[in-house]
Amino acid sequence: MQFAKRLEKIPPYLFAEINRKREALIAQGVDIINIGVGDPDKPTPAHILQAMREAIDEASNHNYPPYEGTQEFREAAVKWMERRFGVVDLNPNTEVVSSIGSKEAIHNTFLAFVEAGDYTLIPDPGYPVYRTSTIFAGGEPFTMPLKAENKFLPDLDLIPEEVARKAKMLWVNYPNNPTGALATLEFFEELVAFCQQHSILLCHDHAYSEMAYDGYKPPSVLQIPGAKDIAIEFHSLSKSYNMTGWRIGFAVGNAYAIQGLSQVKTNVDSGVFKAIQKAAIAAYNTDEVELQAVMSVYQNRRDIIVKGLQSLGWPIEPPKATLYVWVPVPPGYTSTEFTTLLLDKCGIVVPPGVGYGVSGEGYFRIALTICEERLHEAIQRMQDAGIRYS
């Protein structure tokens, strides 16, 4: 028995050593504070649970769902896109498809459009799935560095013309994981123009569209005139509605891109349980006041972490979106060295920035997914251990 050669190209799990040490410390009785995982700790809102309970009792929901999602779900997604972003004239029959979360749809889009010899343009640092899915599809990832001096936006001028000519897809994710960076409509206009010029499929991973603070509302790339000619956007209910385990979302945009994604999906999965789609419809009709109440919890946690780190000398500002704070490591450390120090000295688990790509070196990521008391305790442990930025 032998693994396929493609697995040899998949990088090893970069956090394996940290996980090994974490388990060893837990076995020794050490109280570990894990702020490394972007998995919301709050329950799914009650009205979504109620919609699920009612849908489970309907026998008509117990058989196979439509591959592309129920008509009701796709229409709800279209209405939400119009209500939330002002994106109109989306066709629920040809420009929307349900997905099992967004990770599945992201991966299957690579399989639909990338072949051997094709480039994919992916952000670095970025969601690791962009790179691994490129490799699974037989393509070649070309990384676009995200640098602080460019507000963690890719510089399109740095993409060589010979690479752009062979590129099939360009991936962006704003609000951004792991950096928390934002994109403006003006930047989206640049992306659309670049992808139109080079006949590249523009893919926007919008998993954090509702995870925003201080009154900020992240835009959709589909707000740009002409974007639907070359763009597809991926939405997920996982983070915004505390539904990571439910595995539900949708892809929306260019009809040809949706067709390609759907063709892969119909051959590898059987859709999303119809009762979960009913619950998702309830989620997309969540009252804005209730949604903002959820966001206020994460905003408060953000403020605890940012103020705490500032008190220890860190030169950081509060991010306006996502579940994360992207933090520079103190001078003299690599990201892996510093995250190992936090684990050994403080019992704090955070991922090193290099785990998200070589351009993530020099940073680590904090997830705002544990209670306020434990966040305060994490800062206190760092202070007690004498860990400061400078």
From Swiss-Prot:
Q: Give start-end ranges for the coiled-coil region(s).
A: none
The family assignment reads: Belongs to the class-I pyridoxal-phosphate-dependent aminotransferase family. LL-diaminopimelate aminotransferase subfamily.
Question: Gene3D superfamilies under this entry?
Answer: Aspartate Aminotransferase, domain 1, Type I PLP-dependent aspartate aminotransferase-like (Major domain)
**Has keyword Ribonucleoprotein?**
no
- The positions annotated for binding substrate are 13, 38, 103, 127, 177, 365
A Pfam family matched in the record: Aminotran_1_2
Entry EC no(s): 2.6.1.83
The entry describes its oligomerization and partners as: Homodimer.
Residues bound to pyridoxal 5'-phosphate: 67, 102-103, 127, 177, 208, 236-238, 247
This enzyme catalyses: (2S,6S)-2,6-diaminopimelate + 2-oxoglutarate = (S)-2,3,4,5-tetrahydrodipicolinate + L-glutamate + H2O + H(+)
Q: Which GO terms describe its molecular function?
A: L,L-diaminopimelate aminotransferase activity; pyridoxal phosphate binding
Keywords attached to this entry: Aminotransferase, Pyridoxal phosphate, Transferase
User: At what positions is N6-(pyridoxal phosphate)lysine found?
Assistant: 239
CDD domains associated with the record: AAT_like
Any idea what this protein is called? LL-diaminopimelate aminotransferase 2
